[in-house]
């Protein structure tokens, strides 16, 4: 089990939660980005720097993740690809992706694109709230417990 992070767009507060979780869970945490990242010294935490470019980090995560891994991303197409490989996906607000939630998100994204194309100002997502951070941490723990149980039952 490895936790992969689409790190270029991941909020720092979520990375901090992940650093602590990697130590507590004693799981590898790999932050994939096209820029240098500062991470705390740990035998569980490492960075993987990729070339700059469209979807380069996403493609590397898809290439390396395995069934049972967890991918942290807000990128819906990336979440869809890792689910197809048997990994789990969680966004920084604590929403676990499923095929149904991905379809719903893609429909909403297409709708918002249509609104923007017609000249309507739609704005961006709300800032990450303390409640979002708590929800993320709770879902991360839930994933870990489920994965641990599954591994022990094998």
UniProtKB/Swiss-Prot annotation:
- Listed as disulfide-bonded, the cysteine pairs are none
Q: List the Pfam families.
A: DUF188 (PF02639)
Checking InterPro entries in the record gives: UPF0178
Q: Which domain of life is it from?
A: Bacteria
Q: Where are the transmembrane segments?
A: none
Q: Which NCBIfam families match?
A: PRK00124.1
Task: Tell me its family.
Answer: Belongs to the UPF0178 family.
Identify this protein by name. Answer: UPF0178 protein YaiI
Organism of derivation? Escherichia fergusonii (strain ATCC 35469 / DSM 13698 / CCUG 18766 / IAM 14443 / JCM 21226 / LMG 7866 / NBRC 102419 / NCTC 12128 / CDC 0568-73)
What taxonomic classification does the UniProt entry list for its organism?
Answer: Bacteria, Pseudomonadati, Pseudomonadota, Gammaproteobacteria, Enterobacterales
